[in-house]
Amino acid sequence: MKLYAKIPMKEVIYKGKIKRTGTGQGYIYMNDEYLGCRAYIIIPQKYEFDGADYYITIDEVMNKGVHPDNDHTCRIFLSRSHLGRECFVVIDDDMR
């Protein structure tokens, strides 16, 4: 069964690849304004953009916490199996 989602561009706070830490764990950097929030990490099979919305065929969705990194940034940690994959991050509205 495939899951599909339509996400407005203004709700996506990060779109990019999952990077690797020195220990091999995956992470996503973001601004410190989201520190302490919960975030949905959406890993797509494929996606399209029409100028206002992303249309995503979902492979996996995770709900993770945003952790401090230093004074100006924070990050979300992920497993090694997600390294290099494209992802979208949307903040949970209840946690803003």
Identify the meaning behind each predicted range.
Residues M1-R96:
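General detector of folded, globular domains
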